[in-house]
Structure formats: structure tokens, C-alpha cells
Amino acid sequence: MKYVVVSGGVISGIGKGVLASSTGMLLKTLGLKVTSIKIDPYMNIDAGTMSPLEHGECFVLDDGGETDLDLGNYERYLGITLSRDHNITTGKIYSHVISRERRGDYLGKTVQIVPHLTNAIQDWIQRVSKIPVDDTGLEPDVCIIELGGTVGDIESAPFVEALRQFQFEVGRENFALIHVSLVPVIHGEQKTKPTQAAIKDLRSLGLIPDMIACRCSEELNRSTIDKIAMFCHVGPEQVVNVHDVNSTYHVPLLLLKQHMIDYLHSRLKLGEVPLTLEDKERGSQLLTNWENMTKNLDDSDDVVKIALVGKYTNLKDSYLSVTKSLEHASMKCRRQLEILWVEASNLEPETQEVDKNKFHDSWNKLSSADGILVPGGFGTRGIEGMILAAKWARESGVPFLGVCLGLQVAAIEFARNVIGRPNSSSTEFLDETLLAPEDQVVIYMPEIDKEHMGGTMRLGLRPTIFQPNSEWSNIRKLYGEVNEVHERHRHRYEINPKIVNDMESRGFIFVGKDETGQRCEIFELKGHPYYVGTQYHPEYTSKVLEPSRPFWGLVAAASGTLGDVIKDINLSEGNENE
């Protein structure tokens, strides 16, 4: 097993996740099987209860693990399926060590950071790195490890020490370190001092970088590269210029041009890893597909505008998987994507009274969009604005996709304005004692724990069965006319089964349900170009080269190409089945 560690210095949020994902993707083009581990040095057990406005989105895995958003990057770039154990947090590793101490596993010894915690980290990495993550079912050849945060922070100290020891445990030819640093440009001059200081700190902790990936707003000058190489004690070929590009999908090719993979191939002796001809051909095809995808991205002229009506729009990372899914779909449709960010509460009449400009600007964005997306979320703020957006899309014939909460607000809007129940709502927003039974469109799922927040939702990969007589459905056609699909869930509330008949009698058809036939998973509005909602989160399974079908449908409908896309999908799926 080969290990490539990606660490960061100077500041956080510097792009370690994209660089780690891009490095892994390039290793896959050699035919290698690649896995990934993210280390997050915070005390939380997982990301499930963390505010999206503070930490960005919570990414959900097949096994229901609620993890850091970077695991989404790994899955999207590498085409792999990770588990909750691929995300190590301080809280998780401390809990593991304390549980072992309580069981008496340490035989009465004084339990310490070194060696007990650091050994536990190393054991965890070695165990998880061997878990198969792709459709081959085989043990990976390379593990990318991203160390979150900034080297030198007190929170990451145990992990840095564990990795220092780990490099000797596995051997130099099996361990490489890429350090990501910032090269700011001040008054037109590229400054290397922050990188020099970061590498000095890293070396003082016992970690020697094999490559230094320099993040900069512009291409590095040759003199800057030489200066970093000289003062950081590396060769110029070990300094990688990771300047800003118009899309993060260009980063793998940017690294490829600078011979990063050639260096890692030599440094880790990757030529000794046994590969079949099929492995090498699959890797070569991946590179070709990626190059074609980026070329299509650059050559696209037509623009598709999607209004994203959310409640966490002040931090775009809150909807990272959603925006990436829209990007994947747009590239597949050969369109340039323009996301119109609309804060849901700004669509509400109360905003007009307080700030007319904000109100009118938000409605102008919504009305100019080619398609409308209402993503998931929690709480009451902005709900009425989302309902108004769903109403606009339904009445105006604008393509619409509602995800999780988006499905629920679309159902509430339909119950209010089509069925004629103006007081319809959700028991999430109003106590059930304040809602008449017939007005409870969305209810708390009976099996969910109301007392505890962490890890108590309906989580992970679950089946959705397409219902009889749903062959007309666009969303079913987008999935290739299959009988069932498996998608990831994260919710506590569901459509009230008691209102389903009334909704369906007016054309609001629940074309997909769970295996019991009671829990509503997908709806589609008959007679509308594309008005779809999913209780699950399709954005969690979208891949760069294989977009999520509901998002693909939204962008295709917004581009006027839905019929062609469905035809192509059915031809492709039909050929595969023959």
C-alpha cells in the first residue's frame, strides 16, 4: 500500500481537498486503485450536527455516515464509494481510545496521547486504507490522506505526530507528503516568506515535504519557484504551481502538465505495483474522458441559468454537492452554468416592507431563471419564500427540482393553492396541535428519536421503487426505465401518507416510494415540462463524469434538451442491457 499525505500551511481553506482529489484522479489514470481518508481535527464525532453556515455542507455516505464535505470531492473525482470510517475526527478517535480504556484493553497502563492515541490513528489508517471502494471489490493500491486544518495548530498536533511515526512504519518508498501553501501577491510581487515559514514549521515537527503545491492567484514566476526550492530544501521539480483556473476540473490536467505524477511514480516506485492490461486501459480511458469533459466545458457557449433558492446562501459551501451536481449536469448538456443565488426569505412579503431593493432583486433573479432548484435544509426561516418559488415554477411552467425540504415545500404549496387547504404546513414548522389533521402535509417520521439530534435521522443508501403506471414519468425515464433506484437520504420528516390520494387525484403523482409502499420518495407533476421532487439527496451520488439523473433532468429541461437527453439515456441503457 502506498500513502500520499496532503497537508496545508499558512491558512485553512486553501484547496487541499481539490488537490488531494486531483492527485488521486491522476493516480487512477495510471490504472491504480485509489482510496482516500480525511482527517478532521475537531472534537465533534461527525459533521451531522454542525451548522452549514459555519462548516459548509454535511456530506452523507452510503452507510449513513455524516462527514466532511471533502469526502464528497473524493467520491466525485475518483468515482469511489467511501464509508464513515474514511473520515477520522478528533472526537471519533478519542472516543475509540476511551472505549478501549474502559474495556481494559490497555491492561492498567496510563493512557497517553503518545503512544496510545497516535498508535490508534495509525492503526485506523492502515485498517481503513485496505477497504475496497470501487466496483472491482479489490484492495486499493494507493491511499490519499488529507490532513485537515493548518499544520501547527494545536488541534492537529496528535495527527501530525502520528503521521511522523507512520512514515517510518510503512517505509520511505511507501509514503509521500505534499504540502499545500499560499503564495500571496502583494503590490504585484509574489511573496514566498509564508511558504518558507510553513515548511520550517513542518520540518520542525518531523515531516519532510516531497512536493510543495503553491496556491497563487497567478502563475508562479520562474524566480519564485527557484526561491521556494532553495529556501525550502527541495528541487525545482518538487515545487508545483497551482494557480487559479476557471474551473477546478482543470486542476488535474494542470498538475499533469507539471509532471507531478512522473515524480510520484518515481518517488513511490509505482512501477512495482502489479497492474493488468485492463487496469492500464481503464486508466487511459479515464484520462481521455476527463480531457474531453474539460474541452466541452471550455467550448460551451450557451448559458443555462438555475436559481438556487436556499436558506444558507451566505456560505456557498453549504450547498457544495448541489452546485457540483449542477456543474456535472451542465457539462453533460454542454452548457455554461450560471447559478442565481436567491436567499429564500428575501422572496417573502415581509422583506418588501423592510428592503424593497433586496425583495425585487430576488424576484428578478427567480423570474429570469431557466430552472429553479430548492435544496434541503432545516428550520422555519425562509420556508414561505421557498413555497412562493415552488408556486412560481408550477404556474409559470419553469423546470423545478425540489430536494428533501424542496419536495416538502412543493407539496405544501400544492395542497394550499391547488387542493384548497390554505393552512397546510409541516409539523416541523408548526406544532401538530396547531394544525388540523388534514393540514399536516409533512409529518415527523414515527421511528425517529425526538430527543437526540446526532445520528438520529433516516440516513444512508436506501431503495426507491417506481410505482405501477409511472412509465410516463420523465424522472423514471431519466433513470433508464429501471424498476428501482438506490439513493442517499438524510431526513426526519416525510409526506403524510394520508394526503397522498388527494394530491394524486390532482396530478401531483408520487411515482417513487420506499419498499413498504407507504413512504413517498419521488413526485412528479403531470402536464408540467419538469416539476420533480425527491425526498432523498441525489446530489450525494453525482460524479464528474456521471451526473445525478434528477439534476441532469433539471438542467436539460432548462436548456430545452430534455427529450434528447431521455432518448440518449434510453438508447445507451438499452444497448447495455442487450
UniProtKB/Swiss-Prot annotation:
InterPro entries reported for this sequence: Class_I_gatase-like, CTP_synthase, CTP_synthase_N, GATASE, GATase1_CTP_Synthase, P-loop_NTPase
SUPFAM superfamilies: Class I glutamine amidotransferase-like, P-loop containing nucleoside triphosphate hydrolases
Cofactor dependency: Mg(2+)
Activity regulation text: Activated by GTP. Subject to allosteric product inhibition by CTP. Inhibited by p-chloromercuriphenylsulfonic acid, N-ethylmaleimide and cyclopentenylcytosine (CPEC).
Main EC class the enzyme belongs to: ligase
Pathway: Pyrimidine metabolism; CTP biosynthesis via de novo pathway; CTP from UDP: step 2/2
PROSITE patterns the record matches: GATASE_TYPE_1 (PS51273)
Domain Glutamine amidotransferase type-1: 305-564
Gene Ontology biological process terms, A to Z: 'de novo' CTP biosynthetic process; pyrimidine nucleobase biosynthetic process
Reaction(s) this enzyme catalyzes, per UniProt: UTP + L-glutamine + ATP + H2O = CTP + L-glutamate + ADP + phosphate + 2 H(+)
GO molecular function: ATP binding; CTP synthase activity; identical protein binding
Family membership: Belongs to the CTP synthase family.
Xref: NCBIfam families: PRK05380.1, PyrG
Record protein name field: CTP synthase 2
Organism listed in the record: Saccharomyces cerevisiae (strain YJM789) (Baker's yeast)
